[in-house]
Amino acid sequence: MPAVSGPGPLFCLLLLLLDPHSPETGCPPLRRFEYKLSFKGPRLALPGAGIPFWSHHGDAILGLEEVRLTPSMRNRSGAVWSRASVPFSAWEVEVQMRVTGLGRRGAQGMAVWYTRGRGHVGSVLGGLASWDGIGIFFDSPAEDTQDSPAIRVLASDGHIPSEQPGDGASQGLGSCHWDFRNRPHPFRARITYWGQRLRMSLNSGLTPSDPGEFCVDVGPLLLVPGGFFGVSAATGTLADDHDVLSFLTFSLSEPSPEVPPQPFLEMQQLRLARQLEGLWARLGLGTREDVTPKSDSEAQGEGERLFDLEETLGRHRRILQALRGLSKQLAQAERQWKKQLGPPGQARPDGGWALDASCQIPSTPGRGGHLSMSLNKDSAKVGALLHGQWTLLQALQEMRDAAVRMAAEAQVSYLPVGIEHHFLELDHILGLLQEELRGPAKAAAKAPRPPGQPPRASSCLQPGIFLFYLLIQTVGFFGYVHFRQELNKSLQECLSTGSLPLGPAPHTPRALGILRRQPLPASMPA
């Protein structure tokens, strides 16, 4: 048997020990879309409101399909930052971007940030000059033609400010060379932080659905929750259009352990146990149905019917209570009105006046004839009013009897579900009628009247006085008209004869107007 020597066995043993703990060989994590940390088109930005849950800064221009961080102008910078912090410890970000410009040399580039604090616009690719977190830089500076364009992952603790991505203030974790300028289609960058490792893959952008290619894998890297996502861009002496079409964020979590399939006997046992519980529940309710086991659909239908029956009975009980209360109120109102009006043809207890069957007033006790005459004139109106009130009382009595009959029928029969609102409307209408009838009764009760004296006559104007004043006004009007006509005739006669009366002429503006309009005759002296 040949002997094994050298470092080969030790290296294989180390690989065997590390393989179970490798995150790549385990189950993929569960992804959950986080809409408050994402944006995409169409209708990416709301008119006048910006991007939901995001803020834009600098020279960023919001559109319906994309966010243009910097236009193709020199010395411009713009950024977008999430308003909400990241509450989870593992995440994945998919960013779709496009960088276009003239020539082979590009502007400064773009950056994707995950930092402890929200930034606005800074000197490092439009982002923060001093940050606590990581930044993925898409560099395309015109000065570095050898290593440009490139993608770099930098980390910083926020203590030393940085002016450029490679000035030494930040720690470079990894990089790869990737030409992302002037692609036929927008390129996608997938950044995954899982198991304290940061991985990034990109597609070429030559076709809309290119597969992703590996770029950077750094770790161990500790990124605490509570940070903010951001994307920034900047231009220098040369200008490019830096566009972000979508920014999708997913939270990652451990997959839940799969439930092993239960054996057939255990499933049957659980099903029988559920049926037994249902039977005991039905027996406890006191139902008379057959206790033979039924299918799940039939049991569910029976439970729904039982629930509907209980709900219907409860509604019927409430309807009966409302009808009883309404009947009591109607009876009380009827007693009050009968007490106030009394039956037809019977004298009232106060001796005010007596009514016959036709609600007329044959006699009225009083001490003067003029009071009897005024009351006899208004007796027809008062009788009509009392007759209308008596008719209304009879109608209310009929409605109360109908309500009592409906309550008696509801006790022995089931009403269809959904008619409760009709009784509520009836109760409301009868309540309004009762309130309207209580108003005159309260007014009559509050008005004090000595016993034996009829109600006071109306305080309105007497017809005789009204006719007297009308006659005086008519006579005066006709007298005035006759006087004006006579005056006009006398003036016309004077003008026709050419001689004026010796007496003083009356001062009337209309007569003078007629005099001015008449031409002077030739025989009148000047």
From Swiss-Prot:
Cytoplasmic side: 484-526
Topology with respect to the bilayer: Single-pass type I membrane protein
Tissue specificity of this protein: Highly expressed in normal and neoplastic prostate. Also expressed in cardiac atrium, salivary gland, spleen and selective cells in the CNS.
One Pfam entry name: Lectin_leg-like
Lumenal-side segments: 26-462
Cleaved signal peptide residues: 1-25
SUPFAM superfamilies to which the protein is assigned, alphabetical: Concanavalin A-like lectins/glucanases
Molecular function, one GO term: D-mannose binding
Main location: endoplasmic reticulum
Transmembrane segments: 463-483
CC annotations in GO: collagen-containing extracellular matrix; COPII-coated ER to Golgi transport vesicle; endoplasmic reticulum membrane; endoplasmic reticulum-Golgi intermediate compartment; endoplasmic reticulum-Golgi intermediate compartment membrane; Golgi membrane
Entry-linked InterPro entries: ConA-like_dom_sf, Intracellular_Lectin-GPT, Lectin_leg
Keywords: Disulfide bond, Glycoprotein, Lectin, Membrane, Signal, Transmembrane, Transmembrane helix
Boundaries of every L-type lectin-like domain copy: 31-252
Disulfide topology: C176-C215
Residues carrying sugar: N75
PANTHER family: PROTEIN ERGIC-53-LIKE, VESICULAR MANNOSE-BINDING LECTIN
Protein name, UniProt field: Protein ERGIC-53-like
Organism: Homo sapiens
